[in-house]
Regions:
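Acidic, glycine-enriched catalytic cores built around paired aspartates
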Residues: 1-186
Length: 186
């Protein structure tokens, strides 16, 4: 199915896309992500040890792709999570697009299973709609969600909070949105 990019394997593609994913705060997917991240750290430590001893190089591992997730996705075939050949990988520490079936708190709950103490960087690019956290109550809720995330070991969050209609209008009338900042990375 993967080699065929799921062509002719609609049933397998549906099973892959409906399986529990990292980002939904499910036990199985969280355990797999934690295991893989720990294995990644172990491999990096083991492989970099000779260079550290010989040259004094200190490896600073990260869960980071910046915008390379798009180019990397273009170079790889389909994957067992239901991502088709050529589609982007997830960006930085963010779970794969479409996998956060339990919303923001489910995504953050999954991320807290990663061993962030072993990583120098692992930015989460978080896109939220302004209406989700409107008003004083909404702002306080968002503050509490982020505070809880960081208090429990979360590493780094870059928040983008723009209304889709505002972005569309900015494309049509850029002169009316000179102070609008759209951050892609960094």
């Amino acid at each position: 199915a993967l080699e065929a990019n799921f062509v002719g394997y609609d049933d397998v593609l549906a099973m892959c896309r409906n399986a529990e994913k990292f980002g939904s705060d499910g036990d199985l997917s969280n355990r797999h992500a934690e295991r893989l991240a720990n294995e990644y750290l172990k491999i990096l430590r083991d492989e970099s040890k000779p260079y550290a001893e010989k040259y004094g190089i200190i490896l600073m591992p990260s869960i980071q792709s910046d915008t390379h997730n798009i180019k990397m996705g273009e170079c790889f075939g389909a994957s067992a999570d239901g991502r088709l050949s050529g589609q982007p990988f997830s960006q930085n520490s963010r779970p794969q697009f479409g996998s956060c079936s339990k919303g923001l708190t489910g995504m953050l709950g999954s991320l807290l299973h990663l061993p962030f103490r072993g990583f120098a960087s692992g930015s989460l690019n978080l896109d939220v709609q302004p209406a989700m956290f409107a008003g004083e109550k909404g702002e306080k809720l968002f503050e509490n969600i982020l505070k809880t995330y960081f208090d429990n070991g979360g590493l780094h969050v870059q928040v983008s909070c723009q209304d889709v209609n505002e972005l569309i209008d900015a494309q049509i009338h850029p002169e009316n949105h000179r102070d609008l900042t759209v951050r892609v990375t960094g």
